[in-house]
Amino acid sequence: MGNAVLISNKPKWCELIAIGQKKWELRKTKPKLKPPFKVYIYETKEKAFADIGIYGKTKDGVRYNFVHRIGKVIGEFICDEIREVYQCNSGWVAENACVMRREFFDYLGIPQDTHFGYDKKAYAWHITDLKIYDEPKELGEFYNLCPKGFNDETNYACYRERGLKLRFCKYSKNGKCDSKLKIPPQSWCYVEDLESVSR
């Protein structure tokens, strides 16, 4: 498990986060990390959005070019609290996570025009200490731990199992087995905090 999280978000949600309107991030699951922990924001690629030249300002008045950030890690925040939210919390979700009632029900998989499904829940991750990068980061700058890795105690090299062969993966200062991210997560994944990794 890494010591931070990377989330994938559509451009419209990234824009709302960047301008300070979206204060809570909605997810179906939550990490095993205890708050507070760092969350990196990856902005997904959407052609329709990319064709529009949109500029805005963050809550600090910084000009934000939304188009040139797609397909990159645009910023980070600290998640200091996670709340469980249910169908009956749709008003709170609309106000704080900028997700309308119908969108929230669709996200939870609750059929339209139904009052059932109160047991279905999502998790609201609180967004604090938001930083939008002047220069977005590439996905390949982030490391995800290899699930089948183990440490060689003699030289602290890190290896990954490939069939019957052991293939050299990467040296790591702290002896952890890790690899660069190549594709963004569907929702989120564990990563190493860039500030704690010296490569």
Predicted regions span which residues?
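Structured alpha/beta reader/binder surfaces that contact nucleic acids or chromatin modification marks
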Residues: 1-199
